[in-house]
Amino acid sequence: MSVKKQPIVTWLVLGAMMILASLFLTVLPKFGITLGPDPVEKLALAQVPAWVDAQIIEVDGISRRGERLEDIRSIVIHYVANPGSSAQANHDWYVNPESEVSSHFLIGLEGEVIQCIPLDEYSSASNHRNKDTISIEVCHPDETGKFNDESYHSLVQLTAWLLEVSGLQPEDVIRHYDITGKDCPRYFVQHEDSWLDFLEDVAAAVEATQ
C-alpha cells in the first residue's frame, strides 16, 4: 500500500507558521506586546493576601487619580524620606488634599503592610512611570534610609507576591532612582551591594513559592 506524500508547499507553510508563532512568543513581548489575558486585568482580579491591610483612599484626582494602568512593567521601591514615621501616618498624609502623592503599598516599621491604591490603577509615586508600575513606599527609622528587619522582611514578601500575580521577573524590580536619578530609596542607592542582595532575596522568595 503506498502512502501519499504531502506536497512540499504544505511543509513550507507549516514551517513558516512555526517561525511566526515563535516570533509572537519571544519577540513581541520585548516591545510590550503580549498575547493572552490582559496583565492589568489580572492585577484587578488578584486576591490580596490576608497580611495586607487594605485602606484604599478615595478618588480625588491627585493622590488617587482613578485611572487604569496602561500596562505593568516594573515594581518600584521607594523610601518615605520621613524618618521614624509610621505606615499609617503616611497613608493619612496621602488622604490630605495637599499631599499630591501616593503609593500602592506602604510598609511600616513593624512590618505592617497597607494598601492605598488598587493594583490596576495609577499611583502618584514614580513620575512618568506611574502609568505602568506598582509602587511600594517603605518606612525607615533614621536618616540613613536603611530599613529595619521587620520592614525588610515584609518588603521581600510583598515584592515576591507582586511578581507572582503580575507575571514579572525579579529583574523588573527597580528603584525610584532608576527612573529619575533621585536618591530614593536612599540606602539602596548609596549601597548597591545591599540592593543586589535584596533582589537575590526576592528571587529566592519567588522560587520558594513555586
Predicted regions span which residues?
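Residues immediately flanking
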Residues: Y79, V138, Y177
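N-terminal catalytic cores of peptidoglycan-degrading enzymes
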Residues: S2-S126
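Cell-envelope and extracellular/periplasmic
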Residues: I134-E143
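Conserved, mostly hydrophobic/aromatic
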Residues: I77, I136, L155
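Solvent-exposed, acidic/flexible segments
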Residues: E70, E98, R129, T144-Y152
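Basic/polar, cationic surfaces and motifs that engage anionic cell-wall
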Residues: S2-M17, T26-D53, D142-Q210
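Short coil-to-beta-strand
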Residues: N127-S135
